[in-house]
């Protein structure tokens, strides 16, 4: 069986920059958000933040969507339908972006 892990933060930020043209500081913040959510076992998420979700958020930001809204739509909402969890993740992301 093959086992895949997430790229280290520096490489993941470079992926976001190369795929979307996003600014380095924003790419780094998105990677930090992704890493933080991946490590939140308390929320019991069945899915977590993939590099693809971060790329989606970066594309939205690069195309002019406000950063917080882009993270909410592309990163937070695909992870769960539970309103309390969504709000907790939005609050976390708002502090980090």
Task: Describe the role of every protein-language-model region.
Residues 1-97:
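C-terminal regulatory/interaction module of P-loop NTP-utilizing enzymes
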């Amino acid at each position: 069986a093959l086992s895949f892990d997430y790229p280290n933060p520096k490489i993941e930020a470079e992926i976001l920059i190369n795929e979307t043209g996003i600014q380095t500081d924003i790419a780094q913040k998105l990677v930090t958000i992704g890493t933080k959510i991946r490590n939140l076992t308390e929320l019991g998420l069945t899915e977590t933040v993939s590099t693809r979700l971060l790329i989606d958020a970066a594309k939205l930001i690069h195309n002019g969507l406000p950063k917080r809204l882009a993270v909410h739509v592309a990163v937070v909402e695909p992870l769960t339908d539970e309103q309390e969890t969504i709000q907790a993740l939005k609050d976390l992301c708002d502090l980090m972006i």
